[in-house]
Amino acid sequence: MKVYKDVFTNDEVCSDSYNQEDPFGIADFREIAFEVKSNKRIKGNDDYGIADNSEEAVDGMGADVEQVIDIVDSFQLTSTSLSKKEYSVYIKNYMQKILKYLEEKKPDRVDVFKTKAQPLIKHILTNFDDFEFYMGESLDMDAGLTYSYYKGEEVTPRFVYISDGLYEEKF
């Protein structure tokens, strides 16, 4: 299994157990980012509805049981709110930081990053109100944010990651 970690904080933010797709359904963004679909799961109770053979075990849940988004729970992501102006300042600094990282560690990615990053960020800014932002476990604003949004009528969010801000670790 591969776990994806932030290059600046080593926060675990995703794994290869999730199918990676084109961000926002736009194939051109795939060179710089990827998107995964989340699921809800029940956390807390040991029974999980097995005793009553219920497909929707939520009905009989006790007070100590809650529904969680699997990616948020598994990787200890924390929702954070940013104004559009705050995000603009953050992303400008983050993109400069990623560019410097790529120049030092992955010079072959610099041109791709320079070409593809701007349209991706423009898409995020254009649809800013559709996003929820998540931070990794360290809660360090130097790290990359994870972008969450709902696609169509789906009941769980999709999460988008900037690939060049992550590295893979095999387990």
From Swiss-Prot:
Keywords: Calcium, Cytoplasm. PROSITE patterns: TCTP_3. Its main location: cytoplasm. It comes from the Eukaryota. It is found in: Cytoplasm. GO terms for molecular function: calcium ion binding. SUPFAM superfamilies: Mss4-like (SSF51316). It holds the Pfam family TCTP. GO terms for cellular component: cytoplasm. InterPro entries: Mss4-like_sf, Mss4/transl-control_tumour, TCTP, Translational_control_tumour_p. Residues 1-171 form the TCTP domain. Gene3D superfamilies: Metal Binding Protein, Guanine Nucleotide Exchange Factor, Chain A. Belongs to the TCTP family. Involved in calcium binding and microtubule stabilization. This is Translationally-controlled tumor protein homolog. It comes from Plasmodium knowlesi. The lineage of its organism: Eukaryota, Sar, Alveolata, Apicomplexa, Aconoidasida.
